[in-house]
């Protein structure tokens, strides 16, 4: 699997990858003609990105953005040491649940004491980086995959457990039932080594496909 930071997955890269996928997948080729190309998703890496992923878990995008706005107001420098220096209750007042405060605090502590180094992820393979992130409290496989896709810009990641991707695959392929994670992985195996681009397209398709 991939290792290290790659070139950014920008508009040019998305077009290149989707042309390769479409040449080998008729359903993608037909849908691409209807809805066009997705936009890039490039996020910061490191502590701030992982904090944002924790904040966004199980809430709407709008709610997550509002909470992150309040977090930035109390943390002009979003870093692990600055987070640990916050007064008790500050993150709760910003809108994080008690459990998410525990996760963020645990993440910050792991970075400060040297148990976890986000920079080291750049030199790890995809599977190694995912395993490293999954060792942290509150960050599971999906969270790790999202970090690799958008923060490390890894080109061949497919979060098969993502419900929206599963529903998009079901609609794209005209299946009666939503595929599970294993079935989703198998369905896009021929998209390698462009599965991150394929994922972006499926999210785009999920929002824009006709009912």
Show which residues each predicted segment covers.
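C-terminal accessory module of base-excision DNA glycosylases/AP lyases that mediates lesion recognition
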Residues: 1-38, 126-127, 141-211
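Alpha-helical ds-nucleic-acid-binding substructure associated with the helix-hairpin-helix region
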Residues: 8, 27-31, 59-60, 64-137, ...
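A positional/architectural concept
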Residues: 16, 22-53, 58-69, 73-76
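Alpha-helix C-capping/helix-to-loop hinge sites
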Residues: 38, 53, 57-58, 74, ...
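Structural motif
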Residues: 40-48, 95-99, 188-196
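A general alpha-helix detector
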Residues: 49-54, 86-90, 128-132, 164, ...
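Short alpha-helical scaffolding segments that buttress acidic/His motifs in well-ordered protein cores
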Residues: 50-55, 104-108, 147, 198-202
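Short helix-capping/linker segments at secondary-structure and domain boundaries
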Residues: 58-66, 112-116, 152-157, 205-211
């Amino acid at each position: 699997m991939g290792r290290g930071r790659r070139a950014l997955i920008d508009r040019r890269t998305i077009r290149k990858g989707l042309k390769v996928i479409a040449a080998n997948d008729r359903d993608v080729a037909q849908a691409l003609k209807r809805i066009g190309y997705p936009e890039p998703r490039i996020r910061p890496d490191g502590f701030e990105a992982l904090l944002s992923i924790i904040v966004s878990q199980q809430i709407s995008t709008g709610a997550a953005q509002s909470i992150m706005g309040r977090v930035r107001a109390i943390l002009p420098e979003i870093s692990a040491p600055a987070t640990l220096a916050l007064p008790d209750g500050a993150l709760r007042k910003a809108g994080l649940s008690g459990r998410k405060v525990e996760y963020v605090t645990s993440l910050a502590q792991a970075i400060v004491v040297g148990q976890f180094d986000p920079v080291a992820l750049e030199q790890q393979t995809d599977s190694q980086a995912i395993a490293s992130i999954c060792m942290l409290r509150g960050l599971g496989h999906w969270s790790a995959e999202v970090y690799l896709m958008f923060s490390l810009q890894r080109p061949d990641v497919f979060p098969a457990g993502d419900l929206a991707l599963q529903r998009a695959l079901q609609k794209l392929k005209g299946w009666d039932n939503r595929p599970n994670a294993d079935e989703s992985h198998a369905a896009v195996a021929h998209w390698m080594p462009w599965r991150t681009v394929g994922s972006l397209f499926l999210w785009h398709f999920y929002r824009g496909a006709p009912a």
